[in-house]
Amino acid sequence: EITTRLVGSEMCIRDSINLVSMVCPKYLILPYLRETLEDLKTREADAKPNYRVKVVLAGSENDDPDFTKLIESCGALVVADRYCYGSLPGREKIEIRKGETALRAVARHYLETSVCPRSMEQSAMRQRKKYIADVAKEYKADGVIVESNKFCEYWSYERVADTIILPRDFGLPVCSIEKEYINSASGQLRTRFQAFVESLEIKKIQEKEGAKNG
């Protein structure tokens, strides 16, 4: 059983705070962040957890909490999100070098360290795959769901590459999803997510049996 005090869909809703914290003066946003932290300290874990596996959600723009709720209703707890303006990346420290303005430091940081799929160099692509693999390892995820909004060409190509490279090079199962910006095919998506959860459960059972026999 997987228990948690904070589910991925709540993180998706809270990403409004995440976005504001990047552009809002600290004195305005800190009270809300402290309030969220205190709430988590006293919150009890779910009495009857519905989650059977852990997944990382990666992909293009996603500001629809219902999409994450749909994933979690199928038994997959979203333990980390890595989409265009999700929780990850974006929390790394930006160094202001000597003689550099804050604006220039921010611009340099995003140009040099961006993990946006618009950067097509092989080294940048490899770095993005490794980043997702590292996040999955850190949060003990069983697999990755990679989504792209229809007509988002950058993530359409990236999603195909992730589907091949993450399982082959990092041993991470991937569920590849193309979706509308507004979710209108919940029935089809639910079937895909349920099948993915079942495949992850089978993989975990096989690994346990292999460990016993080994």
Language-model regions: role of each:
Residues 11-12:
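Active-site loops and adjacent core secondary-structure elements that bind or stabilize anionic groups
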Residues 31-65, 72-74:
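Acidic, glycine-rich loop-and-beta core segments that form the ion-binding/anion-interacting portion
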Residues 16-39:
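Glycine-rich phosphate-binding "P-loop"
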Residues 155, 160-214:
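Peripheral docking tails and interdomain loops at the edges
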Residues 7, 74, 169-172:
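Short, structured coil segments at secondary-structure junctions
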Residues 1-8:
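Single conserved hydrophobic/aromatic residue that forms the stacking wall/gate
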Residues 59-124, 128-133:
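Redox- and metal-dependent alpha/beta enzyme cores, enriched for Fe-S-associated oxidoreductases
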Residues 136, 140-146:
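Proline-aspartate-enriched helix->loop->beta-strand connector
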